[in-house]
Amino acid sequence: MAIANKNIIFVAGLGGIGLDTSREIVKSGPKNLVILDRIDNPTAIAELKAINPKVTVTFYPYDVTVPVAETTKLLKTIFAQLKTVDLLINGAGILDDHQIERTIAVNFTGTVNTTTAIMEFWDKRKGGPGGVIANICSVTGFNAIYQVPVYSASKAAALSFTNSLARLAPITGVTAYSINPGITRTPLVHKFNSWLDVEPRVGELLLEHPTQTTLECAQNFVKAIEANKNGAIWQLDLGQLIAVEWTKHWDSHI
């Protein structure tokens, strides 16, 4: 999907990977970039507008843990303004295994709820035009960082949800793919809490191994958007974009 002249909603587009990805997106010339984020960062919004003045960049405060009805209300406002939305990026995430309920609420339930809300406007069974969803998951959805099992499980759940969305595309008209970054140098990974403090130095230990920058991740994210492959499981690691072939161990046969 060419980004030029498209309308894009980016949930958590001001975070570490999110902000660099927003920068790369506006360089590609969408018509509108609507950022929904819990963090209000007027400086970042002004920077994005300055990168490409032809792009309309809009910010709305948004917490992914709110009920679906509240998200639907916000999306109604956005759709009334833009008329159409081409791409939804779900990027909210936290890494803190002390906060069990919030980790699941942000990393998994928030993605499900935001997706559910936009179906009101996109689902072809309701006369909608369809759309594209890019969910930021994690390589920990493939193999856990076992010292943060809650985080890893929440990302595995988001990945499974995304894979199902892709399979449902013939019914809903909405396609989906997952973005799975490897260890990326962001404030998120410099210091965080392991589950039951099983490894106090888990962040430091991860950074002893090869990592990637947020810019490298963002540039590959844009490539994945442009590829626009329904059901793709993209691994963004060490500056590379890799299409992961998922191994099927069981099938429901329905």
Swiss-Prot record:
Gene Ontology biological process terms, A to Z: alcohol metabolic process
UniProt-annotated catalytic positions: Y151 (proton acceptor)
GO molecular function: alcohol dehydrogenase (NAD+) activity
Enzyme class: oxidoreductase
Binding positions (NAD(+)): 10-33
Reactions that this protein is recorded to catalyse: a primary alcohol + NAD(+) = an aldehyde + NADH + H(+); a secondary alcohol + NAD(+) = a ketone + NADH + H(+)
Protein name: Alcohol dehydrogenase 2
